[in-house]
């Protein structure tokens, strides 16, 4: 939002079929474009940010189908061009690709070699409290359609304390929501 650039998330956890990313061939009933084409269409710009979450949790039960798509997407020789099975060529050369993973040993070595690793540390309790006050609580109130509902800071602080075993804020977000 701050950069005024479209931001899209692609959840990779458990994904085993590249058709989710690259679409289905037109010969199939209910064929449609893939998630990457959808992002290109929704963005209406050439430089969206695409956040691939849980890279280390891509399913390899059917081989490296999804991983191979990501390897191709990050290949400097392909220049960010992909072929959606439904729509055809898609240019993502201007996109910024961000990948998140917890366990680097579970990421395909060829793909890992193409990524610049930026290690992040978890949030402190005070940072989590600020995130809860400024973002998570207001978002939960908006979703509930209950109007303007206040929450005592001490209550949020207790929720943060109970969720302190995680470095991120995923469980905190679920608890506040």
Protein language model features and the residues they cover:
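AAA+/SF3 P-loop NTPase mechanochemical coupling elements
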Residues: 43-47, 51, 82-102, 147-152
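Short glycine-rich substrate-engagement loop in P-loop NTPases that contacts/grips substrate
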Residues: 12-44
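Conserved catalytic/switch belt of AAA+ P-loop NTPases
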Residues: 51-91, 113
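Conserved C-terminal "switch" segment of AAA+ ATPases
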Residues: 44, 103-113, 117-174
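Short loop/turn elements that form and flank the Walker-type P-loop nucleotide-binding site
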Residues: 3, 22, 43-48, 64, ...
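Walker A/P-loop
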Residues: 1-12, 41-42, 71
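Conserved RecA-like P-loop NTPase ATPase core
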Residues: 21, 53, 70, 97-100, ...
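Helical "lid/switch" subdomain of P-loop NTPase nucleotide-binding domains
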Residues: 3, 32-33, 48, 54, ...
């Amino acid at each position: 939002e701050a950069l005024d650039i479209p931001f899209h998330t692609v959840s990779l956890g458990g994904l085993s079929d590249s058709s989710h990313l690259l679409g289905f061939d037109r010969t199939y009933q209910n064929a449609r474009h893939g998630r990457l084409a959808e992002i290109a269409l929704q963005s209406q710009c050439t430089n969206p940010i695409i956040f691939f979450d849980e890279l280390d949790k891509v399913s390899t039960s059917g081989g490296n189908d999804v991983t191979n798509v990501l390897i191709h997407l990050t290949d400097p020789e392909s220049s960010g061009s992909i072929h959606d099975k439904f729509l055809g060529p898609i240019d993502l050369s201007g996109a910024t690709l961000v990948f998140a993973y917890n366990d680097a040993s579970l990421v395909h070595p060829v793909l890992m070699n193409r990524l610049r690793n930026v290690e992040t540390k978890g949030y402190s309790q005070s940072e989590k409290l600020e995130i809860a006050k400024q973002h998570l609580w207001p978002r939960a109130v908006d979703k509930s359609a209950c109007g303007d509902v206040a929450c005592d800071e001490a209550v949020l602080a207790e929720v943060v304390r109970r969720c302190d075993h995680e470095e991120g804020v995923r469980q905190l977000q679920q608890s506040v929501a």
